[in-house]
A protein has these predicted regions:
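A short alpha-helical element within helix-turn-helix/winged-helix DNA-binding domains
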Residues: 28-34
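Short alpha-helical segments that sit at the start of domains
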Residues: 1-13
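Basic amphipathic alpha-helical segments that dock to polyanions
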Residues: 45-49
């Protein structure tokens, strides 16, 4: 089973944009940070632009957030890159001749819907600024530890 890392990669992109507002930031340099290719980064950035979460001008390596980081939620970012795709997916290729196989989807769907609702509510409470603040706290702690050693 392959898991999507689009959300974490897109948050990575947005944090880089937010903390590098004064610096040039090309899709190639962002891709290097994520260990991916610039084309993938451009696809993510295009989705962010369509969702009106970031702005950029073609040919200029200066993307920017379209609104303050404390007004962008993790749910906004998730919806921008994943659309209405649910977090959990049912296996619809089960054996129709098996009692469990034929009924498991309906049995699980109610629980998956609850999980989706709860996750979206929590994601809507977490802002990009919260993530940036946590990033700065972690880098500060790491720098302090390196100074001690």
């Amino acid at each position: 089973m392959k898991y999507s890392t689009k959300l974490s990669d897109t948050v990575h992109v947005m944090v880089l944009i937010a903390i590098n507002q004064e610096n040039s930031l090309s899709s190639a340099s962002i891709a290097e940070s994520i260990h991916t290719n610039p084309g993938f980064v451009r696809q993510l950035m295009l989705k962010l632009k369509k969702a009106e979460l970031m702005t950029s001008v073609a040919g200029h390596a200066r993307p920017s957030l379209s609104k303050p980081a404390d007004h962008i939620t993790l749910l906004d970012i998730y919806k921008a890159v994943e659309g209405d795709k649910p977090l959990l997916h049912l296996d619809t290729h089960t054996n129709p001749d098996c009692g469990v196989g034929i009924n498991i989807q309906l049995s699980l769907q109610e629980f998956y819907n609850e999980i989706q609702k709860t996750a979206e509510e929590k994601m809507n409470m977490i802002t990009l600024q919260d993530i940036i603040d946590t990033y700065y706290q972690r880098t500060s702690i790491e720098n302090n530890l390196q100074n001690i050693i």
